């Protein structure tokens, strides 16, 4: 193939330079002079170069930094044709594209068995997009769900054995350094100045609850790193990680997120009962010690008051949740029970069916109620099938790594616990970390159940 003449190359370069020169002022104007927005384009170019160089390296870098991404991504959003687009959406697109290309390059590693319930849930969600009262919001929500599946599938290409699972664990642990440091800064600047009674730590995340759920995941993986014989830590790293755990627990308390407290306590209780019962006494003392903290005590005592139904201001958060769940479920008509009202419908119709909404589009704060309302009984059945299949697969990991299997199943249980009281499906960064860990654990489990396929690659891989 003959290369183009020098004149053509020169002319093409001049046209590209002219186009870039004309576009830059328009780009700067669209970014409203914001330094962060102006840096979005160079950052996008770096992502594109990494995408061409090594897609798995790009995915690892995204996961390493995504926990601190909400601060930046929120400031890069711009309105184009009435649709809000930001750098975060472009990163999501890269993640989905990475998964597509990984599967296309090596389809034999695609986890068919666990992908079936995922596909059922995504199909139910896609039907929900078609029925959605707000198409733009529904498409964004669906792309978020699709990115969770993309991260989960990518783990099967990232992890080829127990060694890679350890790398995945370390990656998530390292991702917590920036949020932890930022949280300490936030505490020093705002918490101590205004008092801790009404202070809720959110760090780099958009809401304290998301930070709390992320911390429970990091604490779980810290436990694995400290106790697993598969991870060899130097004395210095072991000391640092051991000191890091109490810091994370302190940050978790400062989020004031009760469901995360319950999930974290349940995880450590299960670990103590199954692995090290000598710590049971310390575990029983932990709630009593936590109640000595004024903010924790107030959050717990708050559940005993404000249960009368008058208005949102006079309801505690749990009583308010019970009310919105009841009104939402009672509003579902029998003909809408199979397929629901469409993706994003609960939030859209909340001011209609919930008399205490005050005109605010509240989320369900319970993904089981949300899925039943939006995707119907079929969507909820697909969701239940997905988690049942995951539980079945993760049990097999115990043959390879008993503690690793416990950590993965505990993460599954944690996810189900917090899903009963929050809008977990909307928390993108947290979900990415959950699904990369679950995908990595499933990859380890499946790698041990297909020895014949490993010996004879022509017969396929993880199915």
Please provide the spans of the model-predicted regions.
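A juxtamembrane structural motif centered on a specific transmembrane helix
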Residues: 1-20, 228-229, 399-402, 423, ...
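N-terminal signal-anchor transmembrane segment
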Residues: 9-101, 127-131, 415-417
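Alpha-helical transmembrane segments of multi-pass inner-membrane proteins
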Residues: 10, 17-25, 43-48, 99, ...
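Membrane-interfacial loop-to-transmembrane alpha-helix junctions, especially the N-terminal start
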Residues: 51-63, 108-121, 167-172, 240-241, ...
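Aromatic-anchored transmembrane helix interface
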Residues: 86-96, 113-124, 135-157, 176
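A membrane-periplasm/extracellular boundary helix in multi-pass inner-membrane enzymes
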Residues: 181, 189-190, 255, 272-312, ...
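Long extracytoplasmic/lumenal interhelical loops at the membrane interface
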Residues: 193-197, 201, 309-326, 330, ...
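Loop-to-helix entry and N-terminal half of a specific, functionally important transmembrane alpha helix
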Residues: 244-246, 366, 385, 392-422, ...
